[in-house]
């Protein structure tokens, strides 16, 4: 079932990557949009780069984006973590 999943604080290496990894393992969420949000743009970009590599490595179908704009990130979110 496609969802828009927003991960607040995703620039934190432990939280962001572990949460993305857990989502990638869920077949029911495959095809969902994952929005990584953090106020630290540098850390956020690093997390997105690793998340994209994991996505390619594991061959899963998720749309992963990143934003420092909380209001935009939360727009039409179905799940917020």
Question: Predicted segment positions?
Answer:
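Metallocofactor- and cofactor-centric catalytic cores in central/energy metabolism, strongly enriched
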Residues: 1-81
């Amino acid at each position: 079932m496609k969802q828009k999943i927003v991960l607040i604080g995703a620039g934190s290496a432990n939280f962001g990557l572990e949460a993305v990894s857990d989502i990638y393992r869920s077949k029911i969420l495959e095809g969902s949009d994952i929005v990584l949000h953090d106020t630290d743009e540098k850390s956020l970009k690093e997390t997105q780069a690793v998340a994209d590599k994991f996505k390619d490595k594991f061959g899963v179908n998720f749309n992963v984006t990143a934003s420092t704009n909380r209001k935009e990130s939360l727009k039409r979110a179905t799940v917020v973590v």
